[in-house]
Amino acid sequence: MAAADALANVRNIGIMAHIDAGKTTTTERILFYTGITYKIGEVHEGAAVMDWMAQEQERGITITSAATKCEWKGHTIQIIDTPGHVDFTVEVERSLRVLDGAVAVYDGVAGVEPQTENVWRQADKYNVPRMCFVNKLDRTGADFFRCVQMMVDRLNATPLVLQVPIGLEADHIGVVDLIDMRALTWRGETQKGEDYAVEEIPAELADTAAEWREKLMETLADVDDAVMEKYLEGGEFSVEEIKAAIRRATIAGKANPVLCGSAFKNKGVQPMLDAVVDFLPSPLDIPAIEGTGTDGETPLQRKPSTSEPFSGLAFKIQTDKHLGKLTYMRVYSGVLESGSQVVNSTKDRKERIGKIYQMHANKREERSSAKAGDIIAVQGLKQTTTGDTLCDPANPVILESMTFPEPVIEVAIEPKTKADQEKLSTAIQRLAEEDPTFRVKLDDETGQTVISGMGELHLDILVDRMRREFNVEANIGKPQVAYRETIRRKVEKVEYTHKKQTGGSGQYARVIVSLEPLPLDNDSPTYEFANAVTGGRVPREFIPSVDAGAQDAMQYGILAGFPLVGVKLTLVDGQYHEVDSSEMAFKIAGSMVLKDAARKADPALLEPMMAVEVTTPEENMGDVIGDINSRRGIIQAMEERGGARVVRALVPLSEMFGYVGDLRSKTQGRASYSMQFDSYAEVPASVAKEIIAKATGE
C-alpha cells in the first residue's frame, strides 16, 4: 500500500505558454519556494537555473525542456519547463506526451497568444489535464477578466476562476481566494514573497468576489452531477467538497482552474503550488497507459504500479559533456534497476541500463533504481531514440509513440576545412539523435550538406551549437523553403523487374506494387508500407529490402528532387530467382518501382503554409490585408483585441521571407506579427512550374 500512497503524492507537470509569458520565471519561483535554490535566478540576468544552455542564457528563452524535482507540503512535484517559441514545438510535444498535468502560464497583458493556442491543442491531443496561471498582472495594461474571456473564445476552455486579483498594474498586491472567500496579500517588506497575509476581502471587491464565487459554483454544477444535485437543492458546500469537485472536473478534462498573480514580483506563487497539489492528477489518477504487443496489434495495458512489469518511454536524448548520451525516460510501470537488461521493443533490440540519474535543471543525483511515475535520465543506452519504448524482456509491450512535424526550412552548410568536415558529421549525428525535427541530407549534385528544421531560429541555434559544442567552422547558405512532393491519385499493378545476368553472380528481382495518397494532416504518417504478397512469391527476408529501397527513392522525389510524402506503398506480388535474387536486387527494384509508380500517380508539389497573425492599428488594416493578399495569403479571420486589430491568415512560407521589414515600413513599426507552421498545401501550377524549372536547372 505504501507504494501506492507515495504515488498518490506525485505530480508530474509541465509548464507551458507563449514565449515571454513568464514560464521560466514562474518555474524559478517554484524552485525557490520549495527550497531547491537559495537565490532566485532571474531570466533577465541570464542566471535562471532552468535555462542551462549558453544560448538560452544569452537569448533569454528556453530551448530544451529542463526537468527538475521539488517537494511541496509532503508532495513530490516533477516539473518540465517547456519552450514557448514555435520553432521548438517538438520539445513541447515530447514533454506533454509523458506528463500527467500541466500549468498554462498567460501574459496578463497579451492574453491568449498564438503559441498558447498551439500548445493547448497539443495538450488536447494527449488529454493532459491543465490549470491556468494568469501572470504579469503587475504590468501596465494587464486585464485578468479579458484573459479569462479569451480562454473561452480561443481555446474553447471552461475556466474555473478560483481567484480574482486585488489591484492591477502597480497596485497589484494580491488575490481573493474564491474557495475560502478570503484575501491573500503580499505587501511591504515581504517582497521576496515568502510570507503572505490572510485578510478580509476588501470592501470594494466584495461584490466582484461574490459574483465570481457564484459563477464558480455554476460552472462546477454544469460539469459535475454531484454538485448539480446539491446546488439545485440550495445546499451549502464545504471547502473540502468544492476542492474535490474541482479536482474531479480538472482530471476529467472538463474544466480548468484559473489562478493569478505576478511571478516576477513573487505574488501568487504559493497558492499556485497548492493548486498543483490539490487539483492536478497523480500517476494513479490517469488511465493505465495503452500499448500493443510486439505484433503491433494485440492491445495491452500497463498500470502505474511497482508490481507490474517494467515499461517506460524515452522522450528525449541529450548529450552531456561528462556522461555522454543521456536518455530521458518516463517510467510508467514496474521498477527499473541500474545495470539491468531491458528490451527496446520499438526496435527489438536489447539494451543495458547504465547509471540512473534524477535530474535537476543542470545538476543530477545518482539513483540505484526508478519506479512507476518517475521521470529520470539513463546513461548507457546505445540504440534508443525519442519515442521508443523500453520494457521488461519477459513482458514486452510497445507504447504509443509520438508524431513529429515535417521540417519547413533548410540551409546548405559547407565546412571550411577538411578537419571541419569530420567534426560536422559527428555534430550532425549527435544533434539529429537529440532532435527528431532536425533532418540532414546530402545534395548529390552540389555535394553540400543540407540541414532542415522548424524555422530560422531553430536552425540558427543548431548551427550555433555545432560551433560551440563541436568546434565546427562552416559557411551557411541562405534559408530555403523545404518543399515536398506528393501524389494525387492511386495507381495499381505497377511493375518493375531488375535483372543483371551477364557472367558471374547475377541480380534478379521483380516487384508489383500499388501506390496511393495518404491524408496530409499533421497527425498522419508521411509514409506507410504494406505487404500483401501471398504464397511466398517474394521470400520474407527480401520484403524489408523493397521497403528500404522505396524509402531511399522517396528522399529525392521525382518532380524536382524534393522528398516525397503522403504515400502508401503496397507490395502486391513479385518473383525471385533461387540463385540471383538478393537483398540488394530487391532494394534496387523497390527504389525503381516507387519512382515509376509516383510518376504515374499524378505527382504534385507541396509547400509549407504558415499560420500568420498580424496585430496592427486600425488605420493600417487595409495595407496589411492588401500585402497578405499579394503574398498569396488566405485571410481566415479578423478580430479586435485591446484596441488593435488582429488579422489571421494562411500564407506560404516562401512569400514570408523579409516580411518583418515590409510590415515595419507599411505600418511605421506599429504592427507586430507571429507565425507558425500550419500544414503542407499544393503549390499552384504556375508557381510550381517555376520552382521545378529552378530545381532541375531547366
From Swiss-Prot:
Primary localization class, coarse: cytoplasm
Keyword Magnesium: no
CDD domains according to UniProt: EF-G, EFG_III, EFG_mtEFG1_IV, EFG_mtEFG_C, EFG_mtEFG_II
Recorded superkingdom: Bacteria
UniProt signal peptide: none
InterPro entries in alphabetical order: EF-G-like_DII (IPR053905), EFG_II (IPR041095), EFG_III (IPR009022), EFG_III/V (IPR035647), EFG_IV (IPR047872), EFG_V (IPR035649), EFG_V-like (IPR000640), G_TR_CS (IPR031157)
Domain (tr-type G): residue spans on this chain: 8-284
Biological processes annotated in GO: ribosome disassembly
GO cellular component: cytoplasm
Binding site for GTP: 17-24, 81-85, 135-138
UniProt-recorded name of the protein: Elongation factor G
The species this protein was found in: Salinispora arenicola (strain CNS-205)
Taxonomic classification: Bacteria, Bacillati, Actinomycetota, Actinomycetes, Micromonosporales
Name of the encoding gene: fusA
